Amino acid sequence: MNEKKYEITNIAHPHYPWLHRIRALRDVREDVRAGDLGGFVQSEENLSQEGQCWIAGNAVVAEEAYVYGDAILWDHACVRGCAAISGPSRIGGNAIIEDYAIITAGYVHGNVHISGNAKLFANSVTGGIPVVMEGATVYGELGGEFEVRETAVILPGVTIDNPTSDVIHIGPDDIAIERKFKRESPTLTPPPGFQPKQHTTVKKRHRSEER
């Protein structure tokens, strides 16, 4: 097993004394150096000792939740239950990720609530990731370029995967599309060997010429 990247200190959480701060034992990433304090965990089962994943600020990962890969938590974010956070995921603000939610790619910030069997993931075509912010709630599955804002809700059982580079904005009362590239009139290329038909103009005879 690789050398441990963090240890659990004796610094207890002010409200949940069974949670303790972590401390980096080596440089983890550019903004996390050896000796830096991080957020709170319940045990080493909450944060992988491998990769560049990290819990910063006053963020909490507890119960059976697990953070791994390159995921980053900060501010007062809370991950609990059996939730799993990985990949290029960024979780901040007062976000709560719980139950069996899985985030493999996404940016979450604000008073967001992600629970149930929710999933956030990157689209396999564009690599785009969803953004969930402000007071949005997600119970369903989102992939690709989305921005879910304000008090919008993605209901359970809903799966939306955006395979385009356009950003789909979902608010509580509206859906809007932000086009990444200017739309131009399409230019069509003729198939190989195509020859346009020659049109023959027939002169209409005057009635006097028919006599």
Whereabouts are the PLM-identified features?
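Feature marks extracellular polysaccharide-active and adherence modules
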Residues: 56, 62, 68, 74, ...
